[in-house]
Amino acid sequence: MLVACALAILPARAAEPQAPGMSMVTFNLHHDREDWPQRRQVILRELEALQPDAIALQEVIQKPYVRNQAAWLAGKLGYDYQFVSTDPPGRFKRYGNALLTRRPVLARGEHLLAPRTDYRTVAHLRIDVDGQPVNVYATHLNERSDENGGRIRGEQVADLLKYIAATSGDAPVVIAGDFNALVDAGDLSVLRQRYGDSYGSVHVNNELAQVSTLNRHYYEAPSRIDHIFFQQDQLVAREARLLFDQPYAEGRWASDHYGVWARLQFAP
């Protein structure tokens, strides 16, 4: 009895502090299809709960009766944002990619990827994560599944890496988005020489071929094509999971893609 009483009054052990690092989300919004006013509330609630350091968004749209989706989410979250589109400012409809962050922005940029005829972009923010600069990039590569699509994605990856080399300096790099390619696809082989797959690094013992970021409600075959890549000599993936992989109501989904969340740790 005395031992039990003594144990009862011992102070609770403090939780182990997490090692310095950052969290990242990537998510294809499916633009304004299928009840965007309802979907955006579902997306907002999840992002509010997660409070990621940075968010990469694809298929972001802005139309006369649809406020820029990245701007709306950033405003509700209290985040800064960078929207990138090949559609010029002032155009009645603009479509592109975006980065959102709750961290101070040290630099920002954008780039139109080669081949220019495919109208693909990359957004860049350098953010301050508790005194550590980190470069985050968001992109969305060509969607074709044939040989020509692979060739185009290969060209886009080469141009993306060239842009990163010109803008990243010495700070760690995270690249997120909808790559329309499996992580081991030849299209991504050059990128994978230096950048790790956050989800695959964490779930090494799982049957990754059965994991899909395409919503199985819309697509029959599993396909993990949405990725968060991290610079392997600067960062380590500690946690990763899918987001929005359950309906928020019967037959209602946040998007035709699932999101990906990852927690990255700065390498010692």
Spans of model-derived segments:
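N-terminal, active-site-proximal structural segment of metallo-dependent hydrolase catalytic domains
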Residues: 2-76, 89-93, 158, 263-268
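Active-site beta-strand/loop signature of hydrolases that rely on acidic residues for catalysis
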Residues: 22-29, 43-66, 100, 125, ...
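Short, solvent-exposed loop/turn elements at domain surfaces
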Residues: 31-37, 109, 207-209
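Structured beta-strand-rich core segments of catalytic domains in phosphoester-bond hydrolases
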Residues: 36, 54, 58-141, 236-244
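Sec-exported extracytoplasmic/periplasmic mature domains
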Residues: 48-52, 74-78, 105, 165-169, ...
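Active-site neighborhood of phospho(di)ester-bond hydrolases with catalytic His/Asp-centered motifs
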Residues: 56-58, 82-85, 174-178, 197-201
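Active-site-proximal segments of metal-dependent phosphoesterases and phosphodiesterases across multiple
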Residues: 140-160, 183-192
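Metal-dependent phosphoester-hydrolase catalytic domains
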Residues: 165-173, 181-268
